[in-house]
Amino acid sequence: MNNRQITTLWSTLLVEALIRQGVDFFCISPGSRSTPLTIAAARNPRARTKLFADERSAAFFALGYARATEMVAPLICTSGTAVANYFPAVVEASMDFQPMLIISADRPFELLECGANQTIRQEHIFGSYTRWSMQLPTPSVEVPLTSLLSTVEYAVAKALNTPAGVVHLNQPFREPFEPESVAANNHAWWQSAQQWLASKAAHTTTTVEKKHPNNASITLLRQHLTTAKQPLLIAGSMRCKDDAEAVAALANNLKIPLYADFSSGLRMKSNLPPLQLLMQSPAWRAAFHPDVVLHFGGNVVAKHLATALREWQPAHYMVVREEPMRFSPDHNVTHRLEASIAATAHALHNSRSTPLWRESEADHFFAQAAQELEGDVVADQPITEISAARLISRHIGTEQALFVSNSMAVRDMDMYAASLHEAGIPTAINRGASGIDGILSTAAGFACGHGKSTTLLIGDIAFLHDLNALSLLGSLTVPLQIVLLNNNGGGIFSFLPIAACDDLFETYFATPQHYSIPLAAETFGLHYANPTTNSEFVAAYHQAQQSPQSTIIEVKSSRTNNLQHHRLLNARLQAIAAKLFNG
């Protein structure tokens, strides 16, 4: 067997090993050094592939796909800076425990650090942001076939299982790269390869059991819940819908208020009142004052909760999550349980039986708050950033998914969304590192993974940051409805103290852009709408939902007016709470 034949068969086996682990969607960026891997994926009848000119976009797409499916979509790229472009998405995936598998082609040993073209040190390039990385050998019949198979299968297991995250396989190849089939022969390596290919079975199957809480931990949590004067449940970021549903069921069983963050997937679920609206009220925080807080999952979007926890200083602040990483941003967690969220929540049912705290006042508040918010979506009123978020939450279909960008978009959805969907809506954000990069790409991957028409709420700076990702949408099998909140700059900075620095603010922080969104839509073959009223927005949104083609709905706003709108609305909501909860 010559080198070309060995490389072809090696790459075929590598891809087939992935397929037999349930991995069947590959994100490929064109390149010469990665030719053997690309051809192996393209020729495998069970592999699905998508091509990306930009590796950064590819990695964020794979991240979105993982958020939807809890499965890796292997990234294949050539050598050099191609692999480095994965880094932003690698950080996000690692920080938010999302599975990702990178297979980067590389130069062989003899071309490293000798001035060879397009050659960098790729092994361990992602540092501490990987769960595992491995430098694979250059394809050779001297390497036992079983070692290649078990390495690939272990890579998938490390990416998927707790703590899920990024795995990097760095695969060097020697030229030539073009495929060459191998005729039947007596070579032991070739024969073992054929036997494995014919077997149709995985070489290794990994089973990882859920971390179920032990009796002592459950007894402790139940005791704190039973004796609490006023408990509070928090649903932070979660990967699994079953976990989120279990936490919601626990809150209902125990009649304990539940703070359901947008990242939990519960925020728009019916029968879960948005505690976000109360959390910003000093009157409510002073009156409520929980002594026991049970926090499931990870972080939350709004700062109001952290402010409240600092004020309350609960005697017991307990966190339940599977990942073995520290989670205590304010260093106030008193007990941490590494266990299945769903199993823990189920085990805590019937811990207490007391009526909801000041249920009548809370019901009155949420009824009046809903009236205030509905006043913002009156048909003939101008469309605003707040009303756009609320109208999406009201009109998104049960068969759709929702992705929301960081910065103001997720804050508005977390705060002002309507809670109307009995079964909930598949939702996601990139909240691991909370960047605004790669949002369009991630949303496209999220839509692809779900196989559902997906709405994206995004600001103009995040939109421009990932503009080239619009090129992906034409080949998606499901459309995106991109609701673009365009306040001509970084609107969130208007809410920060730096806004008072008149000499610097506009140039260095607001950073206004003056690009034509309609021309961008035309360039990439997308539909475009620019509604000016709430009724026009609803009509444009409904039309986009019914279209097989992706649409950009541009909502133009003023940063100054948006800031004032938020302040006035929040002041009215706080006034309602003050009347009900003062004294």
From Swiss-Prot:
Cofactor comment: Binds 1 thiamine pyrophosphate per subunit.
Cofactor requirements of the protein: Mg(2+); Mn(2+); thiamine diphosphate
UniProt-listed GO biological process terms: menaquinone biosynthetic process
Keywords, sorted A to Z: Magnesium, Manganese, Menaquinone biosynthesis, Metal-binding, Thiamine pyrophosphate, Transferase
Enzyme Commission number: 2.2.1.9
Signal sequence coordinates: none
Keyword Transmembrane helix appears in the UniProt entry: no
A GO molecular-function annotation: manganese ion binding
Pathways involved: Quinol/quinone metabolism; 1,4-dihydroxy-2-naphthoate biosynthesis; 1,4-dihydroxy-2-naphthoate from chorismate: step 2/7; Quinol/quinone metabolism; menaquinone biosynthesis
The keyword Transferase appears for this protein: yes
Root EC class: transferase
Entry-linked Pfam families: TPP_enzyme_C, TPP_enzyme_M_2, TPP_enzyme_N
Top-level division of the source organism's lineage: Bacteria
Catalytic activity: isochorismate + 2-oxoglutarate + H(+) = 5-enolpyruvoyl-6-hydroxy-2-succinyl-cyclohex-3-ene-1-carboxylate + CO2
Subunit structure: Homodimer.
Family as reported in the entry's similarity comment: Belongs to the TPP enzyme family. MenD subfamily.
Function description: Catalyzes the thiamine diphosphate-dependent decarboxylation of 2-oxoglutarate and the subsequent addition of the resulting succinic semialdehyde-thiamine pyrophosphate anion to isochorismate to yield 2-succinyl-5-enolpyruvyl-6-hydroxy-3-cyclohexene-1-carboxylate (SEPHCHC).
Protein name: 2-succinyl-5-enolpyruvyl-6-hydroxy-3-cyclohexene-1-carboxylate synthase
